[in-house]
Amino acid sequence: MNILLLSAGGPTAHGAIKSLRDINFDGKIVSIDSNPLSAGFYLSDSYHIVPKAFEDGYIEEIWKIINKENIDLILPTSSNDIVTISKNSHLFEGKLFMSDY
């Protein structure tokens, strides 16, 4: 299973990556953030720099990453991601780990 963590620079993403590593997660951890110096990038197997969640092109970039990295599960970790992704949840059916908008 390949997991995509959104907003890799925040404490929630950092904690999620650390927890996955602690249990010897047998999959790929991919992270995204708009900040090229995001701390989560250094803990992930791969990473991508994307627009901010409320900017144009954000959803399209996520889909490019989903296809390129064979993502099975998306884990939004910031309030901006949660709002944007939940408003577009119909585009990600079966891949989201979050409640409905």
Where in this protein do the model-derived segments appear?
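Extreme N-terminal starter segment of soluble prokaryotic enzymes
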Residues: M1-L4
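Surface-exposed amphipathic alpha-helices with a cationic face
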Residues: G10-N24, I66-N67, S86-S89
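A short, GP-enriched loop/loop-strand-helix hinge that lies immediately N-terminal to
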Residues: I71-Y101
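Short, polar loop motifs at secondary-structure junctions
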Residues: I32-S38
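Conserved N-terminal Rossmann-fold NAD(P)-binding element of oxidoreductases
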Residues: L6-A8
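Short, structured coil segments at secondary-structure junctions
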Residues: Y42-S44, L91-F92
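Conserved beta-strand positions in the Rossmann-like core of class I SAM-dependent methyltransferases
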Residues: K28-V30
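Glycine-rich, highly charged phosphate/nucleotide-binding loops
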Residues: S46-I65
